[in-house]
C-alpha cells in the first residue's frame, strides 16, 4: 500500500485533491540538483512544476514534485534592443508588468497569462496575436544528471502552435532554467487580432494595450484562485483551407484566422458551443459559461475522472459534427 503525504491542491490551478510523496520548493540551482539526486537515489519519479497552471493530475503522484521558485530578471541594453535574461521560476505576468514599468515594451499582448517563465517556451504561450517565439532569443536548459547548462537558440526550439522541441522531445532529466527575450526599442503596437481591432492604432500605448487585455481576460476567463481551472483545455484546431472553407460557408459566424502554408485556425470554443454543450457538466466538472474552451472544477469538488470524461464527450461531439479532432492543450499527468 502506497502512502501519500502532501496535498497538491494549492500547487496546481485545477485544485484537484491529489497527493504527492513529497513536495519541495526550490529557490537555488544547488537545491534543485540536490533534490533530483535524492529522488534518483530513492528511485522515485521527479516532476517540476511552476504554477501548475497547465496540468491535470489524474491520480496521486508517487514521487517528488519540485516547485521552481528560482526567479530573477536581468536587463542588458543594446543600441536598438533590450535583452532580458529571465529565470524560469519568475511569474510570467510579473515579468510583463516589470518590463512595462521599465518602459520596455513588446510583451503587453501576453498580459495576465498564468504560469511561470519556464513554462513559456514549452507551450510557446500566446495570446492576442503574439507568441513567445516572437520575442525569444534563447532558452537555457539545465541537465540535472551532469549539472551542465546548454543554451538553445530560438531557431532550434522548433516552436509551433502551443508546441516546441521541449514538448516534442521531453527529457525528464532536464529543466528550463532561464530564457532570453529580445525586445526592440522602437515599439510598434500589435492590434490586428479580432478582439483588439476596436483600439485605435493612432497614439495607442503599451500601457493601454496591457490594461485592455487584462480587462478582456478578467471578463471572460475564470479566476483560478476562486474557480479551479487550467485555462484553455483544448487547442484551437488548425486545418486545411479547403476543409475550413466548407465549414465557414455553412457557418458564417465562425471565427477563423489564416495560418502559414495554406492552413486555417478555427475557434475551438465556438465549435464546442455549436455542439450545444454550453454549460454541460459531468459531476462537478463543467464547461465554463463564458468560454467553452475552459473546463472548470465547480465548487472545487470535481475529480480528475469527471474532467477527463467531460473532455472525451466534447472531443467526440465535435468530431461527429465537424469531423475535427480537438487536441488537448492541458498536460495530463498520470
From Swiss-Prot:
What are the required cofactors?
A: FAD
**Localization annotation:** Cytoplasm
The record ties this protein, via Pfam families, to: FAD_binding_4, MurB_C
One of the entry's Gene Ontology molecular-function terms is: UDP-N-acetylmuramate dehydrogenase activity
Catalytic activity of the protein:
UDP-N-acetyl-alpha-D-muramate + NADP(+) = UDP-N-acetyl-3-O-(1-carboxyvinyl)-alpha-D-glucosamine + NADPH + H(+)
Q: In which pathway does it act?
A: Cell wall biogenesis; peptidoglycan biosynthesis
A Gene Ontology term for the protein's cellular component? cytosol
This protein's record includes keyword Cytoplasm: yes
Keyword Methyltransferase on this protein?
A: no
Q: Which PROSITE patterns match?
A: FAD_PCMH (PS51387)
- The UniProt entry annotates the active site at 162, 232 (proton donor), 329
EC annotation from Swiss-Prot or TrEMBL: 1.3.1.98
Tell me which Gene Ontology terms the entry assigns under biological process.
cell division; cell wall organization; peptidoglycan biosynthetic process; regulation of cell shape
What are the record keywords, sorted? Cell cycle, Cell division, Cell shape, Cell wall biogenesis/degradation, Cytoplasm, FAD, Flavoprotein, NADP, Oxidoreductase, Peptidoglycan synthesis
What are the FAD-binding PCMH-type domain coordinates in residue numbering?
A: 16-186
Q: What HAMAP family does the database record attribute to this sequence?
A: MurB
Q: Which NCBIfam families match?
A: murB (TIGR00179), PRK00046.1 (NF000755)
Family stated for the protein in its record: Belongs to the MurB family.
Function of the molecule: Cell wall formation.
Q: Which named protein is this?
A: UDP-N-acetylenolpyruvoylglucosamine reductase
Amino acid at each position: 500500500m502506497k502512502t501519500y503525504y502532501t496535498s497538491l491542491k494549492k500547487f496546481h490551478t485545477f485544485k484537484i485533491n491529489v497527493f504527492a510523496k513529497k513536495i519541495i520548493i526550490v529557490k537555488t540551482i544547488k537545491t534543485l540538483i540536490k533534490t533530483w539526486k535524492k529522488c534518483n537515489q530513492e528511485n522515485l519519479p521527479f516532476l517540476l512544476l511552476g504554477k501548475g497552471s497547465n496540468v491535470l493530475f489524474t491520480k496521486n503522484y508517487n514521487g517528488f514534485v519540485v516547485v521552481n521558485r528560482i526567479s530573477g530578471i536581468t536587463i542588458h541594453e543594446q543600441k536598438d534592443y533590450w535583452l532580458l535574461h529571465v529565470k524560469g521560476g519568475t511569474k510570467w505576468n510579473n515579468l510583463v508588468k516589470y518590463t512595462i514599468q521599465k518602459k520596455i515594451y513588446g510583451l503587453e499582448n501576453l498580459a495576465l497569462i498564468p504560469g511561470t517563465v519556464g513554462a513559456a517556451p514549452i507551450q510557446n504561450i500566446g495570446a492576442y496575436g503574439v507568441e513567445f517565439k516572437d520575442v525569444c532569443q534563447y532558452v537555457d536548459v539545465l541537465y540535472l544528471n551532469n549539472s551542465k547548462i546548454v543554451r538553445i537558440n530560438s531557431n532550434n526550439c522548433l516552436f509551433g502552435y502551443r508546441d516546441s522541441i521541449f514538448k516534442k522531445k521531453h527529457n525528464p532529466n532536464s529543466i528550463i532554467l532561464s530564457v532570453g527575450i529580445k525586445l526592440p526599442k522602437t515599439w510598434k503596437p500589435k492590434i490586428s487580432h479580432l478582439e483588439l481591432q476596436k483600439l485605435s492604432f493612432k497614439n495607442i500605448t503599451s500601457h493601454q494595450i496591457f490594461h485592455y487585455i487584462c480587462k478582456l481576460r478578467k471578463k471572460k476567463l475564470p479566476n483560478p484562485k476562486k474557480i479551479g481551472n487550467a485555462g484553455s483545455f483544448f487547442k484551437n484546431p488548425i486545418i486545411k483551407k479547403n476543409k475550413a472553407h466548407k465549414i465557414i460557408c455553412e457557418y458564417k459566424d465562425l471565427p477563423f484566422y489564416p495560418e502559414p502554408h495554406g492552413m486555417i485556425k478555427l475557434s475551438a470554443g465556438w465549435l464546442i458551443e455549436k455542439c450545444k454543450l454550453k454549460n454541460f457538466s459531468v459531476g462537478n466538472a463543467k464547461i465554463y459559461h463564458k468560454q467553452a474552451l475552459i473546463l472548470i472544477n465547480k465548487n472545487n469538488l470535481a475529480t480528475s475522472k469527471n474532467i477527463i470524461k467531460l473532455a472525451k464527450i466534447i472531443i467526440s461531439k465535435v468530431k461527429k459534427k465537424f469531423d475535427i479532432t480537438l487536441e488537448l492543450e492541458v498536460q495530463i499527468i498520470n
